[in-house]
Amino acid sequence: MAVNLFKRLNRRHPDDLLYEDLCRDVGSDRVSRDGASQLLYSRDGSTFPGGIPGVVCSPETTEQVISCVKAANIHNRSFVPRGAGTGLAGGAVPCYDPKVISSTKMNSILEINLEKQFAWVQPGVVNLDLTKALKGSGFH
């Protein structure tokens, strides 16, 4: 509704410039603001009521995450970091029209060191995938 109002007044919505900068910096295939994406990223696994994100960005590298955060700061916009959205504490629920930075495409297990008992994973790795990678090791 706000976007339509801005268009009727022949003005740009504040998210337009942010959206353009993100498309330029991380690629238009990694940035969305359509209704389906907004609905998908409006909730996590908690019972908290959802919020509607302004722009959804799905970076694939650390450098792209940095670009997303810088763009949010330049445009004075808040952002919500989001993994797979399975959290039960409401940490990925967007409030007050923020930008969502989704790490679901950053889902690599970088290193598993059984001797030192650690795993180095990207933020989009879900617990089930790590459990599968550890199968038979005595860890889960």
What are these regions (language model features)?
Residues 1-140:
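Noncatalytic alpha-helical scaffold of FAD-dependent oxidoreductases
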